Amino acid sequence: MKIATLAVVSAFAATAIAGPIRPDGVGNDKFLIELGPGETQWVTKQQKHEMRAYINSIYKAGQGFVDITDEFGTDFTTAEVVPANYPKSALHAAVVNPMIAGLSKENLMRDLNTLVKFNNRYYESPTGVESATWVFNEVQKIIQASGVKGAKVEKFTNKFKQFNVIATIPGASKNTVIVGAHQDSINQKDPMKGRAPGADDNGSGTVVVLEAFRNVLKSKAIQAANATNTLEFHWYAGEEGGLLGSNNIFKKYKADGRKVKAMLNQDLTGFTKKGNPEQFGLITDNTNAELNEFCKTIVAKYAALKIVEAKCGYACSDHASAHRNGFPSSFIAETNFRNTNPYLHTADDVIANLDFNHMLEHAKVVVGFMGELAMTPNL
């Protein structure tokens, strides 16, 4: 995707300022974005939105950038990948199958109907904060109802208004397994005030992770504190602004020396194009090859759909934040990016376009991923 990122840079070269050197007069109105390893530009907020729109017009979905403004002047280097040992087969069906049995399409519908009622979930809008608050409160209710000892939820704040939500289920070890989804949405023409229901992008991933969390907490093994590894469920802020929330989290985890052994991203889980085979898209660029193989094992064991490998370009979603900070990550999307939802980032990204049966298959994969790795020793 090197050529693609260079094409984007060229398209904006007349107005954007080459990085990484801070140009004279640059203040809070300029942002440093990374379009690929070593490819940076200073842009205004308007240019950042225009660049995202330009990228979308060419690639439809995928190919993005990371806003690395806060890294300017630091010695950021891509960390060495945290080593992990993934099972070659699914070994904990007795734990996972009850989780799958509890998954509810009705819960997915109910939760998504709530999310799309916010005018938008843009990371700097009032309703973007309100939607994050709704997710936080919902997670809190789920934890309280479960009675699982040590389970907790916290707000991970950012310099912008919207916060990340992190739920933790402690295990016997500090080795951590994460599933995440961004909950913000954007109307590309009017980010702050425009209608952006974001049903697919990424209300669908948000509620899939929420429903998975609900059923992992119902597991007898989890309730008995038998998990070997710590589990985290993330709902990210500001993905549409350049992976802002997730990059903040994984930068801190890297600085803190956290042992994140696996991260699974759920972004776009509900759209299937008519006339095309229903399938998962397993993203192979900017992800971990060994973890991807484990994901194939999970899909084969617990889901009814098959996988097709695909690429989505640099920084296309939040798994890239984990990847650039040295943590193994995978991304399973609703399909390959050639057949993705044509309504993304518009007022027409609505529930009527989605398939809740497809979303349920994603939820099966998530609980399979989390359940299996929760119980894996020596990860």
From Swiss-Prot:
Glycosylation sites: N202, N226
The EC number(s) this enzyme carries: 3.4.11.-
Residue numbers binding Zn(2+) 1: H182, D201, D267
Gene source species: Trichophyton verrucosum (strain HKI 0517)
Family listed: Belongs to the peptidase M28 family. M28E subfamily.
Ranges in coiled-coil conformation: none
Role, per record: Probable extracellular aminopeptidase which contributes to pathogenicity.
Name recorded for this polypeptide: Probable leucine aminopeptidase TRV_05286
Keyword vocabulary terms for this entry: Aminopeptidase, Disulfide bond, Glycoprotein, Hydrolase, Metal-binding, Protease, Secreted, Signal, Virulence, Zinc
Keyword check for Secreted: yes
Disulfide bonds: C312-C316
SUPFAM superfamilies: Zn-dependent exopeptidases (SSF53187)
CDD domains membership: M28_AAP
GO biological process, one term: proteolysis
Residues in the signal sequence: 1-18
Record note on cofactor: Binds 2 Zn(2+) ions per subunit.
Quaternary context: Monomer.
InterPro entries for the chain: M28_fam, Peptidase_M28
A Pfam family: Peptidase_M28
Cofactor: Zn(2+)
One GO term describing the cellular component: extracellular region
Positions contributing to Zn(2+) 2 binding: D201, E240, H345
